């Protein structure tokens, strides 16, 4: 899936990605980044996974 980083709080280690197709926001945790640094507005690819409180982004990669 693809989306745009709505915001990412580096000090708290989480943020949200807006899904490009649905417009829905999906939670992203620092543990899903594998060392990738996210900035607000970055375009990303990710895998939608089921978390404890609903859908979360996993395997997040920044794209051009």
List the predicted regions and their residue ranges.
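OB-fold/S1-family single-stranded nucleic acid-binding modules
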Residues: 49-64
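Short nucleic-acid-contacting surface segments enriched for D/E, G, S/T with interspersed K/R
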Residues: 33-45
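Long, polar low-complexity intrinsically disordered regions
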Residues: 1, 39, 62-64
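Structural detector for short beta-strands of small beta-barrel domains
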Residues: 1-7
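Beta-strand/loop nucleic-acid-binding surfaces
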Residues: 24-36
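Short aromatic-glycine-enriched beta-strand elements
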Residues: 12-17
């Amino acid at each position: 899936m693809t989306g745009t980083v709505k915001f990412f709080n580096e000090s708290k280690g989480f943020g949200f990605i807006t899904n490009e197709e649905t417009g829905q926001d999906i939670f992203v945790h620092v543990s899903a980044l594998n060392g990738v640094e996210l900035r607000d507005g970055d375009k990303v690819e990710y895998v939608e996974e089921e978390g404890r409180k609903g859908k979360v982004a996993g395997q997040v990669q920044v794209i051009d």
